[in-house]
Amino acid sequence: IELLPILIQTARGLFVAHSHGVIHRDVKPANIMVSDTGEVKITDFGVSYSTGQGQITQDGMVVGTAQYISPEQAQGQQATPQSDIYSLGVVAYEGLAGHRPFTGTTPVDIAAAHVNNPVPPLPDSVDVQLREFVMSMLAKDPLDRPKDALVVSRTLARIERRLLDQ
């Protein structure tokens, strides 16, 4: 299964959710289902947050999976569309490198690494444009990440087309 089409479709799906005020908060491979025809479905919106509803989690409450959690979520801050972009960046990193960017003995150690540790570079074997873009998705500051998930899907689609044309 090719990684880029999965990432592109997942980003599109997240953009649709975000444009309806829904933030997933737990983007990870287990929540990205791929059909036999290659169609992607994002599952488990059980911990999602709707910007239109009252706050259902207390300030400081951490929601998400440690291996894929954004730095701001790990610090108990409100998740935003950029939080989902970060988590999708972790999925992309794992697909390209063969391992997650951060490990630790406990979920707290892993979440702390997302906050405090620089993201290890992706292998040189990964296309330089793709490498740089995935690293931008993993920026510690949400404002340094791509503007929205549509930008993510379009940029990845452009990179995919260029790689296919080579």
Please name every model-derived segment:
Residues 1-165:
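Eukaryotic protein kinase
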